């Protein structure tokens, strides 16, 4: 068995194991290349310190910091708590960053759902929350539960554009599958493409923040209320044939290199998606190893093109089923690959998941023509997130 090293855009990736992807009917079986030097968690993982406080527009922070930095962060936290205490939970938000060109905001993220709040009639209050990926645009509006339909949503979305002086977006992402009909119809009336996707990272984290700062302080707040429209987590299905690669590997990339990949994504890759690491508060040490999955394919460009339309949001090593699970859209889960369940493969999968947790859920997917090649055809930065509390 040979030793392989996967490379992403000139950065050496610590390859744990190269495994064949399952083959569709009639396709030849590919070879298996196992690393002769499996990486153990103790040698390879750098665990970040406790999360530091959020800045006013930052949803959360994952960092490694000194005691001096921690002290300064604590002072900032005190100031932010004081500011949060002044928030009126019944006020609505209508904000556009004055330093941002309104024409540059071409994609929105939205949620339209009930909140754990009762109005004067004793009925649940609904809320529209709209933002962009950088939180340069922020808009909220409350609605009574008897006014929930596509016309209400259409008019509210149009009012976002009018109130903030921004054009209607090209695309709107949303993460609740139960609202797909209403959202798609409302967006369609406005000539906007509605995209079901859990890549609404800024929105999801903003909702978590609003639960703590706004909803829980509202006079009508109902503690312990379960979300009316919970997120789906369906059983994974068979991977479509056009998404098959040849083999894959658990890999790791230093955080400094991940930043470089994200910063150069538009310049170097036709396919892929990044995340705003600064906004999300990822301030890990440059040497912190971020886990990922590298996929080799002899038809890497077509594969990356197909993957690019999936709204990929996460990958998971399911050690119980000895499978690699790909999550996409809002409620789509595929068995991307199975692998032989052994003590060694289970340990590698567990170490990979532990590395994700240590990095605050950050991980990536890279598609290459060859695991030994210098460069990627596609690169997606992914993030594990818990479901929002509302």
Curated annotation (Swiss-Prot):
<keyword id="KW-0809">Transit peptide</keyword>
<dbReference type="InterPro" id="IPR046761">
    <property type="entry name" value="Tab2-like_C"/>
</dbReference>
<dbReference type="GO" id="GO:0009507">
    <property type="term" value="C:chloroplast"/>
</dbReference>
<dbReference type="GO" id="GO:0004435">
    <property type="term" value="F:phosphatidylinositol-4,5-bisphosphate phospholipase C activity"/>
</dbReference>
<dbReference type="GO" id="GO:0035556">
    <property type="term" value="P:intracellular signal transduction"/>
</dbReference>
<dbReference type="GO" id="GO:0009658">
    <property type="term" value="P:chloroplast organization"/>
</dbReference>
<dbReference type="InterPro" id="IPR046760">
    <property type="entry name" value="Tab2-like_N"/>
</dbReference>
<dbReference type="GO" id="GO:0006629">
    <property type="term" value="P:lipid metabolic process"/>
</dbReference>
<dbReference type="Pfam" id="PF06485">
    <property type="entry name" value="Tab2-like_N"/>
</dbReference>
<dbReference type="GO" id="GO:0003723">
    <property type="term" value="F:RNA binding"/>
</dbReference>
<dbReference type="GO" id="GO:0048564">
    <property type="term" value="P:photosystem I assembly"/>
</dbReference>
<dbReference type="InterPro" id="IPR001711">
    <property type="entry name" value="PLipase_C_Pinositol-sp_Y"/>
</dbReference>
<feature type="compositionally biased region" description="Low complexity">
    <location>
        <begin position="61"/>
        <end position="75"/>
    </location>
</feature>
<keyword id="KW-0150">Chloroplast</keyword>
<dbReference type="Pfam" id="PF20429">
    <property type="entry name" value="Tab2-like_C"/>
</dbReference>
<keyword id="KW-0934">Plastid</keyword>
<dbReference type="InterPro" id="IPR009472">
    <property type="entry name" value="Tab2-like"/>
</dbReference>
<comment type="function">
    <text>Nuclear genome-encoded factor involved in the biogenesis of photosystem I (PSI). Required for the accumulation of PSI during plant development. Does not seem to be required for the translation of mRNAs of the PSI subunits.</text>
</comment>
<feature type="transit peptide" description="Chloroplast">
    <location>
        <begin position="1"/>
        <end position="69"/>
    </location>
</feature>
<feature type="region of interest" description="Disordered">
    <location>
        <begin position="16"/>
        <end position="85"/>
    </location>
</feature>
<protein>
    <recommendedName>
        <fullName>Protein TAB2 homolog, chloroplastic</fullName>
    </recommendedName>
</protein>
């Amino acid at each position: 068995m040979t030793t392989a090293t996967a490379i992403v855009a000139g950065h050496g990736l610590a390859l744990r194991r190269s495994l064949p992807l399952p083959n569709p009917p009639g396709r030849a079986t590919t070879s298996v290349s196992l690393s002769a030097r499996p990486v153990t968690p103790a040698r390879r993982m750098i665990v970040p310190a406790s999360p530091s406080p959020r800045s006013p527009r930052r949803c959360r922070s994952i960092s490694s910091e000194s005691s001096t930095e921690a002290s300064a962060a604590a002072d900032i936290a005190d100031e932010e708590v004081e500011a949060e205490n002044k928030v009126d939970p019944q006020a609505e938000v209508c904000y556009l960053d004055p330093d941002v060109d309104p024409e540059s905001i071409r994609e929105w993220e939205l949620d339209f759902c009930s909140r754990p709040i009762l109005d004067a009639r004793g009925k649940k209050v609904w809320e529209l929350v709209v933002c962009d990926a950088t939180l340069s645009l922020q808009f909220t509006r409350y609605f009574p539960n008897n006014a929930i339909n596509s016309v209400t949503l259409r008019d509210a979305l149009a009012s976002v554009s009018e109130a903030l002086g921004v054009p209607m977006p090209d695309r709107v992402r949303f993460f609740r599958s139960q609202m797909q009909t209403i959202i798609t119809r409302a967006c369609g009336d406005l000539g906007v493409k509605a995209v079901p996707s859990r890549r609404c990272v800024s929105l999801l984290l903003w909702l978590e923040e609003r639960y703590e700062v706004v909803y829980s302080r509202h006079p009508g707040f109902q503690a312990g209320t379960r979300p009316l429209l919970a997120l789906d987590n369906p059983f994974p299905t068979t991977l479509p044939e056009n998404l098959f690669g040849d083999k894959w590997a658990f890999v790791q990339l230093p955080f400094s290199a991940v930043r470089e990949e994200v910063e150069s994504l538009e310049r170097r890759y036709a396919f892929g998606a990044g995340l705003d690491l600064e906004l999300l508060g990822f301030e890990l040490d440059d040497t912190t190893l971020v886990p990922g999955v590298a996929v080799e394919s002899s038809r890497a460009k077509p594969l990356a093109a197909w993957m690019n339309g999936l709204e990929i949001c996460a990958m998971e090593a399911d050690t119980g089923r000895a499978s690699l699970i790909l999550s996409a859209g809002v409620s789509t889960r595929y068995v991307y690959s199975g692998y032989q369940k052994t003590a060694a493969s289970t340990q590698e999968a567990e170490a990979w998941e532990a590395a994700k947790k240590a990095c605050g859920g950050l991980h990536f997917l890279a598609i290459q023509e060859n695991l030994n090649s210098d460069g990627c055809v596609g690169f997606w930065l992914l993030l594990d997130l818990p479901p929002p509390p509302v």
